[in-house]
C-alpha cells in the first residue's frame, strides 16, 4: 500500500511541476510575442534603426539571462527570470558583469537577500509612478566573490521601509553602500 501511495505522490508532484513549467513557458512566450509585435510595428512604420536597436537589446538581455542561468544559483535565477511576470510596483532588469562562476554556495543566501530587498522596495515605492530597478551582479571583483549593485529610479512613498536594513544590516552580508533620495536608491552589497 505504501508503494501505491508513494507513486501517487510522485505523479501529483510531477503533474504540479509540469503544470508550473507550462505556466512559465506561457509567460515567456507572451514576452516574446510582445517583443515581436513591437518589431513588426516598427517595421511597418519603416523605423529600421529602432528595429535594429530592439534586436540588439534582445540579444543583450538573452546573454545576461544565459549568464545568470549558468551561475549555478537556481533559486536566484528563478526569482530574477520570473520577477516581471508577477505583481510588483517596479520592473526589474539585471546584468551579470564578469565571467560565469560557480556561486552555488551562495544561492540560498542570495535568493533570501533579494526576496527581502524586493519586498522592501515593494513596500517603499510609490504605486503611482513608473519604478525601475537594475541589479548588476559583478563576478570578477578582486576582493569579493560577488558584488551586487542595486540601482533604483522612480519614486518612493515610504523610504522608511529601508530603515532597519540601513541601520542594522542584513545577516552576514556586507552592505558597502546605501544611498537613498526621494527618487533614487543605490545599494552595493559584497559577499566573500
Swiss-Prot record:
Protein origin, superkingdom: Bacteria
Example of a GO cellular component annotation carried by this entry: cytoplasm
UniProt entry tagged with the keyword Transferase: yes
A single GO BP: sporulation resulting in formation of a cellular spore
Positions of post-translational Phosphohistidine modification: 30
Its biological purpose: Key element in the phosphorelay regulating sporulation initiation. Acts on spo0A. Mediates reversible phosphoryl transfer from spo0F to spo0A.
This protein's name: Sporulation initiation phosphotransferase B
Localisation per UniProt entry: Cytoplasm
Record key words, sorted: Cytoplasm, Kinase, Phosphoprotein, Sensory transduction, Sporulation, Transferase
Enzyme Commission numbers on file: 2.7.-.-
Keyword Signal attributed: no
Gene Ontology terms for molecular function: phosphorelay sensor kinase activity
Enzyme class: transferase
Assembly and binders: Homodimer. Dimerization is essential for activity as both monomers contribute to the formation of the active site.
Post-translational modification: Phosphorylated by spo0F.
SS bonds (residue pairs): none
Pfam families in UniProt: SPOB_a, SPOB_ab
